Amino acid sequence: MTPTPVPPATTPTPVHRRVEMVMGLPISLALRGPHATGVRADAAWAEVLAVLREVDRVFSRYRPDTFISRLGRGEIGVDDCPREVAEVLALGEEARRASGGAFDVRRPGVPLDTDGVVKGWAVQRAAHALATLEDTDLCLSGGGD
């Protein structure tokens, strides 16, 4: 019987992590590969944060000046909001139908609440900024509830 050669041990590629609070959530990014550090990674992370901060500016229920807060109070209509508001409300309607009404962003007697759909939508949208990091593994996460 001939022994099977064992390949030499390789050093695992390090994972580089970044975390910042945005939208009241810890937003974390883990990168591994040739573009995990450096100018490109820094620029991509900055773009991720810019996208999420803009989402917070439009959708935060905790700030009275946001479009979603003003819409919920009836001060403005959907047509007065950025187009992303209609997109997120449509996702909320899809979730309401799919859940048989158990999930509803427009529950009677409760302020308009898109949080259940907007967080995932926002992280997915922000992830597009990471497309420039070819051959680099990544994990973008928006923690919280």
Model-derived regions: residue spans:
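A contiguous, well-ordered beta/alpha segment that forms the leading edge of an enzyme domain
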Residues: 1-139
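FAD-binding core of FAD-dependent oxidoreductases
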Residues: 140-145
